[in-house]
Each structure stands twice: as C-alpha cells, then as structure tokens.
Regions:
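Glycine/aspartate-rich loop-and-adjacent alpha/beta segment that forms the canonical ThDP
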Residues: 60, 64-127
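Thiamine diphosphate
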Residues: 1-72
Length: 127
C-alpha cells in the first residue's frame, strides 16, 4: 500500500504530504543486503515522481531543514539514514541483528547496562 499511496499522491499532485522513512540497512532477520536487498530506495521513489532526499537521521537540524525542501506538486519523502547503534557503540558488535536485543547471559546484560550508561553519561539501570 505504501507504493500505491505514493503513486496516487503523485498522480493527484498532492504536495502537502511528507513522510520520514528510516533507512538503517537492517531487517529483523539481519542486514538488508542479506535478507532482501531493496536496491536504491531514493531512485525508486523519485521514479514515481515524488521527491526523495537523504539526510543524516542523527542530525536534528538536517531533519528540520529537509522538511523545507521545495516539492511543489509532489510529495516529499525524507530518507533518514540512521545507525541503530548510534550513541551505543557496545551494540555495534551485534549489528546487523539489532531489531531486538536478547542477552546471552545475566553477565552480558550487566556489562551492556554499564557500557551503554557510561557512553550516554547516565546512571545504569538498577535491577
């Protein structure tokens, strides 16, 4: 339905429509390239006649600026390029299986709690 809605909004010249699509290169079962490579999303969306632009999802000012992009007569799709372990490098070793995090042991849970809280400069969660 997403593609149909996009196609219809282009067909009808709907330009008060904009959406943010998270592009984090992963699916539940692993990396997009391993599970189901979807190709160049920006090129596909633009080929429908919409305007797709890429921005750094971790840069709030870039996200705000993207919303102002001229897209008269067509919808705007903001492709927010994100890292699922941004600000939590301890999780990087689990990439691309980060859709959910299961701890292998109580020791790993405690280690992750401490490392992530240190990196984020917050107090660890007390269990």
């Amino acid at each position: 339905q997403i593609w149909e809605a996009l196609q219809a909004s282009v067909h009808h010249g709907i330009d008060n429509l904009w959406a943010i699509m998270d592009v984090n290169s992963q699916q539940v079962d692993g990396a997009m390239s391993d599970v189901m490579d979807v190709g160049d999303i920006q090129k596909k969306i633009n080929s429908f006649g919409a305007l797709a632009i890429e921005v750094d999802a971790h840069d709030i000012n870039a996200m705000r600026q993207a919303r102002k992009e001229n897209h008269e007569g067509r919808p705007l799709i903001i492709l927010a390029i994100s890292s699922p372990y941004q600000g939590m490098t301890f999780l990087k070793k689990r990439f691309p299986r980060l859709h959910y995090v299961r701890f292998n042991s109580e020791e790993e849970r405690k280690e992750m709690n401490i490392k992530i809280s240190n990196e984020l400069r917050i107090e660890p969660i007390q269990y």
